[in-house]
Structure formats: C-alpha cells, structure tokens
C-alpha cells in the first residue's frame, strides 16, 4: 500500500535537490483522487527557504555555494533563523545521509574556520577572546549539503554515512572559498551571524558556570553531612 504523504515528501525532496526538475504526483485511487506538481528553479536554496518557512530568518537571502573539486560536485545552501537548533541535512547523489559523513565534516570545518577568521580580521572577535565553536556558529542554522560522486562509499551499520575522503576536502574547499567571498561582500549579514554566534557562546559559557557552581555546592553539602551526624552522636 502506497502512502501518499510519504511519496509526496520524497518527491518534493528530489525536486528541491535537482533544480529545474518537474515531478507530478497523481493519486487515482477511488475517493482519494488528488494531484500535485513539484518544480523548484532555485533548487536547494528554495529547500532552505521551505524548511525555514515557520521561522524568522536572520537575513533575507539564502547563502549559496557551488563548485567542483577532485571529481566531486558540491552544492551548499544555508540560512540562519531565530531558533536555537542546528537543522543541517546532507545528501549524496540525491540520497539522504542521516548519519552525515565526510561531506558534513568538510562543511562544518569550513564553516567554523571561515567565521572565526572573518570575526578576528574584522575585530568582532578580539585576539585574546575564545574562538567561536562550531556549535555556536550553527545555532539557528538551516543548511543543505548536496554532493555528487561517481562511486560513493557508505559506512556504518545502516550504510547511511558517507565515507569518501575526497568529499571532505571538496566541500571544505568550495565552502571556505565562496563563503569567505560572501562575507566580505555582505558585511551586515556577516556581522549579524557573528553576533548571534557570540551570544550563543556567552549563553553556553554562562550555563557551564552555573552547572559547575551547582556541582560544587552539592559536593560541599555532601562533605558537611558526616560532621552533622558526628555532632548528633556526641550529644547523645
């Protein structure tokens, strides 16, 4: 039995991942007749906009990187929003990779490196200040990473993780180069992302200090307990 909604989701995903592709879904079952068409000229840029539809975007335009390195075709689209979660989805030859892999690792490395370099060179982050972590930069990020490889190698028990080493270098190279250019050309957007990342860093550090304080307090209370018991026994 075919589930219409499951097919609809997968076909919409395929249309997003292949810009310009037109897919029609027709249900001719009696009493359940319906028809939909999926066609996105903007490809994965429109995919990010679709995923961010119920959120408030931090900046209007989706950041887009595209290129080919060492036989690997790379496409990346991303946009920050007002949420606190990281919604990054990766694909290889239009197949989802829920466990990530080398393409995701390359993207994350490029993102962290590029934003830290920009923040330091533009005095948003002072030399003696702690570098932004990947988690800080990815807070509120929606991103699509799509690579095309002639011979993909999958790892893990469920084979849902990309293992090709060349994918990491390709994604890292394409994103580093094009994201650096984008940030230099769009300083207002760059500053807004860096400031959001700094807020995430401060919140994370404040939460860590609060946890440490609670743990120390609990430890001290635990240490004082035997003394109280000893006092009671002396009075008896």
Enumerate the predicted regions with their spans:
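GHKL-family ATPase ATP-binding module
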Residues: 1-236
């Amino acid at each position: 039995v075919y589930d219409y909604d499951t097919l609809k989701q997968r076909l919409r995903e395929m249309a997003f991942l292949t810009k310009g592709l037109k897919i029609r879904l027709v249900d001719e079952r009696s009493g359940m007749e319906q028809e939909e068409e999926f066609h996105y000229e903007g490809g994965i840029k429109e995919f990010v906009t679709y995923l961010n539809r119920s959120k408030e975007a931090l900046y209007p335009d989706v950041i887009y990187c595209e290129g080919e390195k060492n036989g690997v075709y790379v496409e990346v689209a991303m946009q920050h929003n007002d949420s606190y979660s990281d919604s990054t989805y990766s694909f290889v030859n239009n197949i989802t990779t829920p466990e990530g892999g080398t393409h995701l690792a390359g993207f994350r490395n490029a993102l962290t490196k590029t934003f830290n370099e920009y923040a330091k060179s533009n005095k948003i982050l002072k030399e003696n200040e702690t570098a932004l972590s990947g988690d800080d930069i990815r807070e509120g990020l929606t991103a699509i990473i799509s690579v095309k490889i002639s011979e993909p190698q999958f790892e893990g028990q469920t084979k849902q993780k990309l293992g090709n080493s060349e994918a990491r270098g390709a994604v890292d190279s394409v994103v580093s180069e094009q994201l650096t250019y984008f940030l230099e050309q769009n300083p207002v957007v760059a500053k807004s992302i860096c400031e959001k990342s700094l807020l995430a860093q401060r919140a994370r550090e404040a939460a860590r200090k609060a946890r440490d304080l609670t743990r120390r307090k609990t430890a001290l209370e635990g240490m004082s307990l035997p003394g109280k018991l000893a006092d009671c026994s002396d009075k008896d």
